[in-house]
Amino acid sequence: MTDPDRFKDALLAELQSLRAFAISITGNVERADDLVQDTVVKAWTNMNGYTEGTNIRAWLFTILRNTFYSDFRKRSREVEDDGAHASRLAVHAPQHGHMDLEDFRRALAQLPDDQREALILVGASGFSYEEAAEICGCALGTIKSRINRARARLGEMLSVTSGADFGPDADSYAALAGADAGGAKAD
């Protein structure tokens, strides 16, 4: 039998990670919050199904993932908001960097569900490849392949050609280089 107090503490410790993962797979904060709530209720109800000493984080993420796919099947007839009205209301500040966060979010949303999920579990949620494979219910090699394909596809969609695409733009880099050179002369 699982100790309710320790179970509650472990569950509460994972709420932020569960919410972040839920937001990333749903693309909608309200649905993500509902998904986390459903996950917590299911986990608490099935507390005795959890084996103490095993990875509670992986167990919770598996519940969340399974709940998401069950809800997805139920909501398959809902019409999604394409953001057309919101895009006319919001104006983004001019960016000097090569990559805008919204560009990344759009590209991430275009990945196949299995690739996006694998990438988020390992890249953003900090799970090992083995843990992600367990959560997704697939082989380790499958997770590695999904992540590799997701990274390659994101690179294509975002026109990333090198690591420099993630760093400062040319103007910022020149300013930083000039500051370094100026600092070296002062010595």
Enumerate the predicted regions with their spans.
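Sigma70-family region 2
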Residues: 38-55, 74-76
